Amino acid sequence: GLTRPCDIAWATELRPDYAGFVFAGKKRRVSDDQAAALRKDLDPGIPAVGVFVDDSLEHMGKLVAAGTIQIVQLHGQEDDAMIDAVRQSLQVPVIKAFSIASQDDVRKAEQSRADYILLDHGAGGTGDCFDWALLGQLNRPYFLAGGLNPDNAVQAAALHPYALDVSSGIETDGMKDKEKMKLFMARVRAYRR
């Protein structure tokens, strides 16, 4: 999650495929007003993802309508009915996060009605990877998260996920670090060439 004007400046310079604003928890959380101000300075060609945990459709809709976010990422206990409601009401793509500890978790994620699934270790934000061998023959686009950093960026990219979702692995002392951001993106882009 991006929280400071410098994070936005770096993202605009480095051009990731997505940028995120966290609207849940304590770490990296931004208010609606903070996110709106940050979004104004983010390159309009970079879609902003709003990260939510068991939030209301009304709150998500307010952020979509304001142009603060273009994609909704759900990290709570949201079921397929909520995923359908978000997609149909807000007309934006939905990413649903799943904690992966077993092959059954992967199968459950694969059956989600979300546009994309995000596969993570635990509740997210732990800095730990799950066992990537569990991915096996996953047959749908997925975001890979959990424990990603510049040191394992190439190995993660080699799994051919739709996207990599990195946060704590590009931070120093809990804040985004431009050099780590740059290194992570350079390694992923070099691999994909």
Features from the language model and the residues they span:
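Conserved N-terminal beta1-alpha1 strand-loop-helix module at the mouth
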Residues: 1-193
